[in-house]
Amino acid sequence: MENTENSVDAKSFKNAETKILHGSKSMDSGMSFDNSYKMDYPEMGLCIIINNKNFHKSTGMAPRSGTDVDAANLRETFTNLKYEVRNKNDLTCEEILELMNSVSKEDHSKRSSFVCVLLSHGDEGIIFGTNGPVDLRKVTGFFRGDYCRSLTGKPKLFIIQACRGTELDCGIETDSGIEDDMACQKIPVEADFLYAYSTAPGYYSWRNSKDGSWFIQSLCAMLKLYAHKLEFMHILTRVNRKVATEFESFSLDSAFHGKKQIPCIVSMLTKELYLYH
């Protein structure tokens, strides 16, 4: 692997960033007695990619070099999975919330699922618009079951490439079909969400200026290999392993050299998810 510098997606890693290696209409739910989500709707669904690269001077945050590689890789990957991909670049906090509100009010009744990818600086529980922080729960809350009715019972995937703190991982060496009958069923409003974070709580998330972030590189690679073979959680487990074992930071600053990363999956899915039918 070529040694180009890596950066982190933290809210305020100003100087080292460049030094380091380098609701909707009537409910048409996906609920059924089956153990896997119904994915044979006319459309796979929307994939919204928010790619924040440049930030207002007042934030003190450096540009996220390499993020355009991630955005292009994601667009190709999810287009091949038959999603309708919409790329949005350099959105403010207000624009992010306006976009999520607008998308949640679309009619998703003919769509099997929903995907949103957030590429930005971050910290625990927040993502950064170009002008400051926004609470992740506000971003995702528009798609709760009590707000976005036409996605109730359907998988809602949020993929988040951003730091979740300022800790560094030094690593350690080792040796080693019946929908109508379910239409009135009450389910938790937070059900059927999945959050795929690029890193564990509290930690930096690494990004390479040439190849993009470790997490998005790995996610796209595993989806290309296994999206038509494996259940989604199994794919994410392979993503975890790839990031954990195949990447290590290269930095001119010894404090940031030789560091590791492990993605984190938070699932409230209630069924198995196969991105094909």
Curated annotation (Swiss-Prot):
Annotated family: Belongs to the peptidase C14A family.
Major subcellular site: cytoplasm
Protein name as annotated: Caspase-3
UniProt modified residues of type S-nitrosocysteine: C163
Gene3D superfamilies: 3.40.50.1460
SMART domains assigned: CASc
This protein's UniProt keywords: Acetylation, Apoptosis, Cytoplasm, Hydrolase, Phosphoprotein, Protease, S-nitrosylation, Thiol protease, Ubl conjugation, Zymogen
Activity control: Inhibited by BIRC6; following inhibition of BIRC6-caspase binding by DIABLO/SMAC, BIRC6 is subjected to caspase cleavage, leading to an increase in active caspases.
Catalytic activity of the protein: Strict requirement for an Asp residue at positions P1 and P4. It has a preferred cleavage sequence of Asp-Xaa-Xaa-Asp-|- with a hydrophobic amino-acid residue at P2 and a hydrophilic amino-acid residue at P3, although Val or Ala are also accepted at this position
Pfam families the UniProt entry points to: Peptidase_C14
Enzyme Commission number(s) from the entry: 3.4.22.56
Sites bearing Phosphoserine, chain numbering: S26
Keyword Ubl conjugation included in the entry's annotation: yes
Propeptide: 1-9, 10-28
Subunit organization: Heterotetramer that consists of two anti-parallel arranged heterodimers, each one formed by a 17 kDa (p17) and a 12 kDa (p12) subunit. Interacts with BIRC6/bruce.
Subcellular location: Cytoplasm
Keyword Phosphoprotein: yes
GO cellular component assignments: cytoplasm; death-inducing signaling complex
Modified residue annotations for N-acetylmethionine: M1
A Gene Ontology biological process term: positive regulation of amyloid-beta formation
